[in-house]
Amino acid sequence: MTPVIALVGRPNVGKSTLFNQMTRSRDALVADFPGLTRDRKYGEGNYEGQKFIVIDTGGLTGDEAGIDAEMARQSMQAVEEADIVLFLVDGRAGLTAGDEMIADYLRKSGKQAHLVVNKTDGQDPDVAAADFYSLGFESTFLIAAAHNRGILSLLEALLPEPENPEDQDRADRYPGIRIGVVGRPNVGKSTLVNRMLGEDRVVVYDMPGTTRDSVYIPYERQGHEYTLIDTAGVRRRKNVREAVEKFSIIKTLQAIDDAHVVILVIDAREGLVDQDLHLIGFVLDAGRSLVIAINKWDGMDPEDRDRVKEQVARRLDFLDYADKYYISALHGTGVGTMYESVQACYESAMSKWPTNRLTAILQDAVAQHQPPMVHGRRIKLRYAHQGGSNPPVVVVHGNQVDSLPGAYKRYLENTFRKVLKVVGAPIRFEFKSGENPFATKVDRLTPRQKVKKDNDLKKGRRIKKTRQKSVKR
């Protein structure tokens, strides 16, 4: 299971800076969902192959009834979701009453909490941390998040050893195509999951799982095996009525990561909103195949339907490769037709292509539209081969590929997608420059070249002497 790390502490102690360092990017996989996860940001990190999720909170003042009680509630919710809690304090400001109250709350929570003294740069770290030892935490780490000091040691000490392959690949133990159904609260995820399962009269039963674990439900349909990854908490058929869901980013990230194909459910009556785009960003960053289901299509006026279709076409024009379905999960309209896209997405994501075919596509693309010139030299793309699947990765070798414009990369992606007939799945490209085979060789002249060089030098000396004599005269 992916470890979840929560960062808590007073405002402005460096939580967001540490968050950015742990996710290794200021625009890493980050979501900020107003109203649902206010003042909580979620990101993914990776340390030596060990993935983890980081939750950044807005800050605790130590007083739950303070100016922003909602901020305190969200921070406490992050603590409940986490496996590991990092309690950040400011080494420059020293120990405060707010720090003491937060420490007391963490002790009562029973969570695995560690003290992290930040902003220790420019002073003696031991002196900066001295006051905080009185808080009584078993482990204390000294870091300078702004300068990325001490963070790798922190991760090395806290993250568990990689799980054994049997546990690590638990998703692989489930048969067939794994389908993750994700979406905002109350868009109809539970209804859709039960409709998909109910089409073959599969009995849905309670399965064990914690508050942040997705539920894996294997089933068969028309001779094909599938596993639905449920983030909405589907239970017995008698409890199918859509209630207010508890939205969990943790479940969503887990479902996307484990899935072969992701079905994103959008509420047609509310239209496409920013939170939907955030979720699409999660799917694209994970490189998963995508099918979009616009739900609650029944009972809408023709004018409203046209408006929604226009909005989807305009705001999702960058997803022209993903199939879009207008469905009613409640009545089952259009649900069965999605399986055709699910199957096509899976086949595209798991495809294997020979090197000679990929190279031929590359050469044809270059012949039709050559790469631009850089410093008077044409960028050359020599050959291509496959570097992975789910998502499909195409590795292109050439020279000066670092200078290849984004527009040309998109041209290559569209060309490969069209020729290979890839549906629903993103194609990732990696560009590698070929090394110069003569770079490490000593420049040795042949005997003939040596004679020519000597003659040129002698000729140059004679010309120089002649010019000097002319100047003296």
Swiss-Prot record:
Q: Which UniProt keywords apply?
A: GTP-binding, Nucleotide-binding, Repeat, Ribosome biogenesis
Species per Swiss-Prot/TrEMBL record: Marinobacter nauticus (strain ATCC 700491 / DSM 11845 / VT8) (Marinobacter aquaeolei)
Basic and acidic residues biased stretches: 444-458
Purpose of the protein = GTPase that plays an essential role in the late steps of ribosome biogenesis.
Region Disordered, annotated ranges: 444-473
Sorted alphabetically, which SMART domains does this protein's record hold? AAA (SM00382)
Task: Quote the SUPFAM superfamilies the UniProt record gives.
Answer: P-loop containing nucleoside triphosphate hydrolases (SSF52540)
Where the record annotates domain KH-like, the positions are 351-435
Which residues does the record give as GTP 2 binding sites?
A: 183-190, 230-234, 295-298
Looking at the keywords, is Cytoplasm present? no
User: This protein is called what?
Assistant: GTPase Der
Q: Which domain of life is it from?
A: Bacteria
| Binding locations of GTP 1 | 9-16, 56-60, 118-121
- Residues in EngA-type G domain copies: 3-166, 177-350
Q: InterPro entries attached here?
A: AAA+_ATPase (IPR003593), G_ENGA (IPR031166), GTP-bd (IPR006073), GTPase_Der (IPR016484), KH_dom-like (IPR032859), KH_dom-like_a/b (IPR015946), P-loop_NTPase (IPR027417), Small_GTP-bd (IPR005225)
Family assignment from sequence similarity:
Belongs to the TRAFAC class TrmE-Era-EngA-EngB-Septin-like GTPase superfamily. EngA (Der) GTPase family.
How does this chain assemble? Associates with the 50S ribosomal subunit.
- Primary gene name: der
GO MF annotations for this entry?
ATP hydrolysis activity; GTP binding; ribosome binding
Give any single GO term for biological process. ribosome biogenesis
Question: Compositional bias (Basic residues) spans?
Answer: 459-473
Q: State whether keyword Repeat applies.
A: yes
